[in-house]
Amino acid sequence: MAVTFVRSALMVPGKFPQAHEYLEKRIKWLKEKFGVEASLMALLGGQVGRIATVTEQDDVAQIEKIRREIVGGALPKELATGAEGLFVPGETKDRIWLKIR
């Protein structure tokens, strides 16, 4: 069954353009490194400044494989440290949605 991975974060007020640029670079890297197509979405209604990257995979094992590579050091230094000061600490949320139909 297909799964959708959603990582959302709350951008720091006044840092929206820089946070958006950072996420665009991260999405480009995901495509180049893993062939993953990701969407960038903004919350419409609710908490202002919440933004999310969304990917779809065939199964959770693919998400875990990518996660392990990233944790293992695959993320370039500019992406590993580039988010500092752009997002509110403690406000990043990961969700995995299972497609049932």
Which residues are covered by each model-predicted region?
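Short hydrophobic/aromatic beta-strand micro-patches
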Residues: L10, V54-E56
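Short acidic/glycine-enriched loop/turn segments that link adjacent beta-strands
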Residues: G46-G49
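Absolute protein N-terminus
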Residues: M1-A2, R101
